[in-house]
């Protein structure tokens, strides 16, 4: 099990150009950054742009580039890609361009196995209802893909490689899990299926300067070899230490990242990507 990181572990600090900022050309290191959702961009892109201007070079910044409906929030060139009609694509392009010129450690976040559009167009790649009448749909109206399907692996890998070519340093495959339901057909070993899929995606996409990461629900998930991380969501500050203790991967202070909407200080000793909405709170506390 993983021991909590010591207090003297170097962590990248926002608004800090010093030695603890991330050098994207070197080894993976502990993360302390912000995430930007598509909803944030649609609601107030001016505020998003203002907030990122305050961040120093090499800050880890994550931006959502593809959602669970399957829509892309950028002009993907992939065959079959559905471009979001409710997203200001030129504004997103401007955001990504500014992330480049600011020299951020850039993370693209995509919904991976939860993908309504790809499921509709490629039914045999999805998880079927028990009746086999069609694909199983979750309460949000989304389809889920079968990680043992070759076309699922090819599709996800293609998206990752496109974002890699766009200059992202890391891609997070969100919802890299099975849905929590017994109303669909899957008779295999679910943890093994996910680990095999992760290995295949790593083989297709990884390099010595690029990180592929997996948004999982199980802290005991076994990461494949190579430059990769696991991200854990919906872990409240009171549970973060107990959750971290369940992790079995090597170098957990670097390879296990918590996604949090909160500025709570109990996340500080771990790798954490927080909502951009708490930047002011976190930075004011640091300045005290």
Language model region names:
Residues 5-18, 69-111, 181-209:
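Aromatic-lined substrate-binding rim segments of carbohydrate-active enzymes
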Residues 60-65, 87-136:
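Glycine-rich, aromatic-flanked loop segments that form ligand/cofactor-binding clefts
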Residues 137-222:
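Polysaccharide-binding and catalytic clefts of secreted carbohydrate-active enzymes
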């Amino acid at each position: 099990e993983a021991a909590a990181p010591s207090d003297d572990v170097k962590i990248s600090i926002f608004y800090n150009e010093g030695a603890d900022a991330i050098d994207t050309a070197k080894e993976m290191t502990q993360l302390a950054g912000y995430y930007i959702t598509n909803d944030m961009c649609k609601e107030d892109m001016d505020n998003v742009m203002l907030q990122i201007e305050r961040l120093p070079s090499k800050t880890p910044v994550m931006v959502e580039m593809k959602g669970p409906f399957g829509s892309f929030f950028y002009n993907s060139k992939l065959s079959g890609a559905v471009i979001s009609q409710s997203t200001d694509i030129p504004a997103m392009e401007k955001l990504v361009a500014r992330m480049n010129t600011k020299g951020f450690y850039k993370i693209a976040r995509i919904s991976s196995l939860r993908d309504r559009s790809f499921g509709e167009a490629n039914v045999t790649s999805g998880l079927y209802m028990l009746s086999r009448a069609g694909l199983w749909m979750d309460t949000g109206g989304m389809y889920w893909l079968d990680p043992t399907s070759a076309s699922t692996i090819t599709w996800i890998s293609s998206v990752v490689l496109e974002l890699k070519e766009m200059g992202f340093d890391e891609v997070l495959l969100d919802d890299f899990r099975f849905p929590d339901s017994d109303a669909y057909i899957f008779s295999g070993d679910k943890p093994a299926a996910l680990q095999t899929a992760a290995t295949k995606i790593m083989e297709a996409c990884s390099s010595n300067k690029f990180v592929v990461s997996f948004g999982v629900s199980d802290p005991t998930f076994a990461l494949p070899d190579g430059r990769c991380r696991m991200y854990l969501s919906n872990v409240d500050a009171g549970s973060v230490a107990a959750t971290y203790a369940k992790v079995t991967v090597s170098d957990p202070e670097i390879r296990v990242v918590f996604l949090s909407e909160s500025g709570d200080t109990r996340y500080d000793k771990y790798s954490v990507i927080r909502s951009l909405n708490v930047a002011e709170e976190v930075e004011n506390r640091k300045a005290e």
